[in-house]
């Protein structure tokens, strides 16, 4: 694996997001879908069905949606419908009042847990032949159908994950761009602790996670 391939692979995995990823995936599915509709959904008439894997259902049901400060799938979907973001970071910018309007009446959303593991989110708009499926990665659009037309974005295949031997080779190369990406990610993930070097902070974080 080359440093360029490693950077591309890492960049596909490092996605900035406010809040937990399962609710964000639900919101992202709704946001992506309604962006392609000819007009904004009307809270009085909009209807949707959400089919979601057991793992995602469990995690999204207990996570709090930022700004709304409310747990659950309905809040995530409502935030997605009210989001102004075009990226996976859907909770970073949304119309709070509009989201609360969708939350007042839960009848518009039918939630169907399905016996699947991992990440699977499918949103269907009844009667419109319009739907979206996220699967695998939280931001990966597996299928997008708009009024019966397949509009699935075509992504360039990612490199295969490196073997342990390739990881060591990459580390020995000390590629400046790869190291800059890693440092940026680490410093975002590790909170500053006075009196400890960055290396010590990283070790403390790893130790804490490994010990639960």
Give short role names for the model-derived ranges.
Residues 1-5, 21-28, 68-72, 76, ...:
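Conserved active-site and cofactor/substrate-binding residues in soluble primary-metabolism enzymes
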Residues 104-212:
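Signature of multi-pass transmembrane helix bundles
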Residues 45-90, 100-102, 106:
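A structural-propensity feature for long, helix-poor, extended segments
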Residues 5-18, 181-185:
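Generic N-terminal amphipathic, Lys/Arg-enriched alpha-helix
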């Amino acid at each position: 694996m080359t440093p360029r391939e490693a950077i591309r692979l890492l960049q596909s995995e490092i996605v900035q997001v406010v809040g937990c990823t399962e609710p964000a995936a639900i919101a992202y599915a709704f946001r992506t879908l309604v962006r392609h509709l000819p007009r904004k959904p009307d809270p009085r008439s909009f209807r949707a069905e959400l089919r979601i894997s057991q793992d995602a259902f469990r995690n999204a049901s207990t996570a709090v949606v930022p700004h709304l400060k409310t747990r659950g799938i309905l809040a995530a979907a409502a935030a997605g419908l009210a989001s102004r973001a075009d990226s996976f970071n859907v909770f970073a910018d949304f119309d709070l009042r509009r989201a609360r309007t969708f939350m007042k009446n839960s009848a518009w959303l039918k939630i169907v847990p399905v016996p699947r593991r991992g990440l699977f989110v499918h949103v269907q708009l009844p009667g419109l032949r319009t739907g979206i499926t996220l699967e695998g990665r939280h931001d990966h659009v597996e299928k997008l159908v708009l009024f019966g037309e397949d509009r699935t974005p075509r992504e360039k295949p990612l490199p295969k994950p490196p073997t342990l031997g390739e990881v060591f080779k990459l580390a020995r190369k000390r590629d400046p761009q790869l190291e800059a990406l890693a440092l940026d990610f680490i410093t975002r993930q590790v909170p500053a602790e006075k009196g400890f070097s960055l290396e010590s902070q990283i070790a403390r974080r790893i130790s804490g996670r490994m010990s639960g």
